[in-house]
Each structure stands twice: as C-alpha cells, then as structure tokens.
Amino acid sequence: MNTFKVQFFSPDDQISFSGVVSLSVTGLEGELMILAHHAPYLIYLLPGMITVKMSNQTEKKVVIDSGVLEVANNNCSIITSQIQVFDRAIHDEKSFKNKRISIYLSYLDEKFLS
C-alpha cells in the first residue's frame, strides 16, 4: 500500500504520523485530499479539521488554526499556530466541538474585527 508521512508543527508542539494513506484538508481553494506520491504543492489552510487516514484503517482527527501545507518528496508538512488532536479516549465530543469553535472564532475575530 502506498503511504506517506505527515508532520504538524506549531510553536508549542510537533506531531508526526507515518503510514498515512490520505489526508483531507480545507484550503482557500476548497477541499483537498492528499495521497501518496502527490505532486509538490503549497497551500494556505483555513482553520478547521484535518482527517488523517492511516494504513491500519484508523482515522485521526486534528484541529488546526490557519496554516500552510507543503507536499514534497512523499512528505506532508503543516505549519500552524495551534494543533489539537482529537482522541475519544481523552476528549468527549462536546469539549472537542467547543475547542474547534474557539479556534474558528479566534480566526474570525482576527480576520474581520481587527
């Protein structure tokens, strides 16, 4: 199976996933799915949820603030100011939605009220 590596970077954290089958993100151009051996690409990401599908059939959900995604050499790097990984064992759905909403609201405040 074709897989690739995804790395998230923020000032406070760094998270890596190996064995990724697909990555779903939302950028300025709309929804985008990254697969293994994707052509080199650079895109501005909107705040929101990123879905990481692993080769073992599991999914990871990551909430980010706005950021930049770069794809090169079968690696994907995401640079953002905030990273929050959702884990059902740790978070309940309500607290996760509240965290996601707070990220969206801070983005809207920054963009439209500044």
From Swiss-Prot:
One of its GO terms (molecular function) is proton-transporting ATP synthase activity, rotational mechanism. The keyword Translocase does not apply. It is found in: Cell membrane. GO terms for cellular component: plasma membrane; proton-transporting ATP synthase complex. Keywords: ATP synthesis, Cell membrane, CF(1), Hydrogen ion transport, Ion transport, Membrane, Transport. It holds the Pfam family ATP-synt_DE_N. CDD domains: F1-ATPase_delta. It is a peripheral membrane protein. InterPro entries: ATP_synth_F1_dsu/esu, ATP_synth_F1_dsu/esu_N, ATPsynth_dsu/esu_N. Its main location: membrane. The keyword Cell membrane applies. It comes from the Bacteria. Disulfide bonds: none annotated. F-type ATPases have 2 components, CF(1) - the catalytic core - and CF(0) - the membrane proton channel. CF(1) has five subunits: alpha(3), beta(3), gamma(1), delta(1), epsilon(1). CF(0) has three main subunits: a, b and c. Produces ATP from ADP in the presence of a proton gradient across the membrane. HAMAP family: ATP_synth_epsil_bac. Belongs to the ATPase epsilon chain family. This is ATP synthase epsilon chain. It comes from Wolbachia pipientis wMel. The lineage of its organism: Bacteria, Pseudomonadati, Pseudomonadota, Alphaproteobacteria, Rickettsiales. The gene is atpC.
